[in-house]
């Protein structure tokens, strides 16, 4: 199949996927889009939102529609790396046998990732980066495709272990999950307080997802789009010669080269899902906020003057 035909097929599958997901999830269009873009782009996602906004349900629903295995890990202060990676046990033959942990799954929901100590966070982040884990000196590859969706609660920050910048950088997207609108909440309450059950169809499988991930990397990009993405990221760096006034006034730390890479991959995927065979600058802009918002560090002045991260990114674009 030619790449053009494959993109057309991806568009059809994407629409079918969204229809299936919306049988269960009411609203949250942007969140669903961004999670699907990160899956097809071979990235990982950090969902930030207060409890009860269907973050877990969303991941569960997506894994059903994609026909992938799914595990949920609830991160707590006493969780150890071996609890998520797995450990060696002595079997009845008196031999050591590796017992796989919950990380060995296609989709892993890391719930409240900031509630666990750095030691356990780093075990998860090694898995995200290397797509394999190390236990008792042996390396074990994780199932492919492998996708981590971590959640974080923006309130109740006491007793948490905030993710350092280097670890946040591993996430392709930082997705804000907002409260539903009045009409959406009406629909949610109506659907969840009755005894109706929804059966979901499997739209694509793991092999097709990996084919689509390869397809997206093959999509060509014009030099002006590439230049726009790299320049946008460079504008976030305070000591860059082209840094605008807003960067010097409100940003302490800018984004690294990984942001430029993700902007291009995200733009390619956004273009493909919308039936375009090559991304333009609008596609870069469409994915800029979730890619940049966790890679920039605001200073005290920005916080004091109420300059949100999204507002700064908008002005930079």
Where do the model's predicted regions map?
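Short glycine-rich substrate-engagement loop in P-loop NTPases that contacts/grips substrate
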Residues: 77-106
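Conserved AAA+/SF3 P-loop NTPase catalytic/coupling segment centered on the Walker-B
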Residues: 82, 104-129, 143, 158-167, ...
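AAA+/SF3 P-loop NTPase mechanochemical coupling elements
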Residues: 97-106, 135-152, 163-172
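Conserved C-terminal "switch" segment of AAA+ ATPases
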Residues: 7-11, 24, 174-246, 273-277, ...
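C-terminal engagement/docking regions of AAA+ P-loop ATPases
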Residues: 1-2, 240-317
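Walker A/P-loop
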Residues: 39-76
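A short helix-turn-beta junction within AAA+ P-loop NTPase domains corresponding to the substrate/partner-engaging
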Residues: 68, 161-178, 196-199
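Pre-Walker A (pre-P-loop) alpha-helix and adjacent loop at the N terminus of AAA/AAA+ ATPase modules
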Residues: 7-53
């Amino acid at each position: 199949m030619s790449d053009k035909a494959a993109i057309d097929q991806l568009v059809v599958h994407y629409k079918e996927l969204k229809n299936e997901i919306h049988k269960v999830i009411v609203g949250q269009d942007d969140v669903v889009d961004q999670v699907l873009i990160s899956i097809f782009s071979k990235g990982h996602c950090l969902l930030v939102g207060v409890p009860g906004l269907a973050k877990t349900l969303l991941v569960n629903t997506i894994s059903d529609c994609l026909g992938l295995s799914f595990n949920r890990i609830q991160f707590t202060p006493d969780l150890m790396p071996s609890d998520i990676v797995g450990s060696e046990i002595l079997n009845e033959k008196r031999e050591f046998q590796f017992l796989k942990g919950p990380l060995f799954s296609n989709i892993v929901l890391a719930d409240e990732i900031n509630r666990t100590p750095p030691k356990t966070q780093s075990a998860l982040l090694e898995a995200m980066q290397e797509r394999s884990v190390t236990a008792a000196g042996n390396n074990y590859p994780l199932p492919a495709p492998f996708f981590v969706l971590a959640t974080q609660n923006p309130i109740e920050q006491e007793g948490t272990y905030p993710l350092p910048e280097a670890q946040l950088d591993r996430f392709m997207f930082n997705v804000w999950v907002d409260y539903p609108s009045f009409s959406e909440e009406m629909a949610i309450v109506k659907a969840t307080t009755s005894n109706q059950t929804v059966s979901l169809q499997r739209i694509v499988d793991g092999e097709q997802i990996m084919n689509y991930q390869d397809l997206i990397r093959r999509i060509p990009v014009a030099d002006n789009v590439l230049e726009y993405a790299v320049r946008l990221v460079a504008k976030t760096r305070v000591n860059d010669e082209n840094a605008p006034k807003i960067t010097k006034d409100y940003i302490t730390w800018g984004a690294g080269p990984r942001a430029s890479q993700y902007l291009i991959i995200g733009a390619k995927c956004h273009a493909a899902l919308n039936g375009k065979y090559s991304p333009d600058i609008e596609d870069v802009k469409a994915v800029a906020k979730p890619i940049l918002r966790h890679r920039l560090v605001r200073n005290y002045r920005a916080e004091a003057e109420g300059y949100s991260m999204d507002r700064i990114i908008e002005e930079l674009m």
